[in-house]
Amino acid sequence: MAGCVSQAAPSEPWLQNVSIVGVKQIDRIVEVVGETLKGNKVRLLTRNRPDAVLSLPKMRKNELIEVLSISTGCLNNCTYCKTKMARGDLVSYPLADLVEQARAAFHDEGVKELWLTSEDLGAWGRDIGLVLPDLLRELVKVIPDGSMMRLGMTNPPYILDHLEEIAEILNHPKVYAFLHIPVQSASDAVLNDMKREYSRRHFEQIADYMIANVPNIYIATDMILAFPTETLEDFEESMELVRKYKFPSLFINQYYPRSGTPAARLKKIDTVEARKRTAAMSELFRSYTRYTDERIGELHRVLVTEVAADKLHGVGHNKSYEQILVPLEYCKMGEWIEVRVTAVTKFSMISKPASIQEDQQPLSLMHLFPLAVFCLVLITLYSVDRFLYPGFFEEWLPFLADAHHDEQQAEMWEHHDNSDPVFYE
């Protein structure tokens, strides 16, 4: 067992008879597997060693997307979170190493998208005398034409000091205008109990600035509902925030106590009430959409990077990281395509190439199917008349009989000696 769970809770009964690799020892995974196969139980949980090197071998789920972790750990001490117990304080990877990793992924390995990730993207560099904009400016320099970068989750406190710089980066033509800022609650009282180190006003300051300065920005956020100290009034504040911004991506989480965390010692809200609040916010989220009917007919340039679950469409994103589906027959993975929106759903827009006329449809096997069936029927009827039931046409299909008779006459003329013509009636 490797990762956060084994590091944070190694004494759990179900972990007693397995080998464990902590988050600071992940570069020794091959060694641990080898010892385990020999029948030895290994437990590597040391915290005070340097972090595993950034350039460990990896296997991409999507060969077109490089997921680059820029740091490990965080600067916060949220009362509900157990990740800090496993990953510890912030450790930022060196700027030069990250830039080289990105350069190699783009130029040597052919990826088309770079996704930056960490426990808190905005905190990068604060332990090494740098700030996130320093890294982002260097990364955009190595992004080739036709490729894009997407920023991961960043908590409000560490973006407040750099609103102008972050907006500038998000407006860069090779960076998606996408920002994931988890608010968790819109109640200042609950945020204080969570030790989130910001207020609702801080979050709104960020959101309002980005909306005003980054055209068509896509803002995603998270909510934790039924935190032990959340009142109905607190919950309503969170509902009001969702109504105000209508977040296109909203990750709704019902609070669950994590053993060993300060919040786990607090009295839980009744389960029925917790589910009621979760259902209410989920219903609110379903009641609106970014993709309205008014958007049908819009033109977009999208980068297609994967196949949709229906296996009929390619999944692409425009500059605002809006999801746009394109019929697979028109897609080439890793390339851009100009499309026109033809339909909308809650989570995406459906499109076809802008070069296709309104009444023009792609040629596919489905379009040839009726013709194939018709031809098969004719062949079958011809075979029945000729080999199984002579006179079938005359008896059952008189409207075809004359045509068939003409065909027989033509055949007889073809094989008869032309010097002694015979006429058939």
Curated annotation (Swiss-Prot):
Q: What does the record's cofactor remark say about binding? A: Binds 1 [4Fe-4S] cluster. The cluster is coordinated with 3 cysteines and an exchangeable S-adenosyl-L-methionine.
* Source taxon at top rank: Eukaryota
Domain Radical SAM core: start-end pairs? 60-295
List the GO cellular component terms: endoplasmic reticulum; membrane
| Entry's Gene Ontology molecular function annotations | 4 iron, 4 sulfur cluster binding; metal ion binding; N6-threonylcarbomyladenosine methylthiotransferase activity; tRNA (N(6)-L-threonylcarbamoyladenosine(37)-C(2))-methylthiotransferase
- Record-linked CDD domains: Radical_SAM
Q: Which reaction does it catalyse?
A: N(6)-L-threonylcarbamoyladenosine(37) in tRNA + (sulfur carrier)-SH + AH2 + 2 S-adenosyl-L-methionine = 2-methylsulfanyl-N(6)-L-threonylcarbamoyladenosine(37) in tRNA + (sulfur carrier)-H + 5'-deoxyadenosine + L-methionine + A + S-adenosyl-L-homocysteine + 2 H(+)
Membrane topology (UniProt) = Single-pass membrane protein
Task: Give the UniProt keywords, A-Z.
Answer: 4Fe-4S, Iron, Iron-sulfur, Membrane, Metal-binding, S-adenosyl-L-methionine, Transferase, Transmembrane, Transmembrane helix, tRNA processing
In short, the EC number is 2.8.4.5
Binding residues annotated for [4Fe-4S] cluster, in chain numbering: C74, C78, C81
Give the transmembrane ranges: 362-382
Q: Tell me, what is an example of a GO biological process annotation in this record?
A: tRNA methylthiolation
Q: Which cofactor does it need?
A: [4Fe-4S] cluster
Q: Which Pfam families match?
A: Radical_SAM
Q: Where in the cell is it found?
A: Membrane
**Limits of the TRAM domain:** 293-355
- Report the function annotation for this chain: Catalyzes the methylthiolation of N6-threonylcarbamoyladenosine (t(6)A), leading to the formation of 2-methylthio-N6-threonylcarbamoyladenosine (ms(2)t(6)A) at position 37 in tRNAs that read codons beginning with adenine.
> Family, per the entry?
Belongs to the methylthiotransferase family. CDKAL1 subfamily.
Q: What is the name of the protein in this document?
A: Threonylcarbamoyladenosine tRNA methylthiotransferase
The organism named in the record is Caenorhabditis elegans
Lineage of the source organism?
A: Eukaryota, Metazoa, Ecdysozoa, Nematoda, Chromadorea
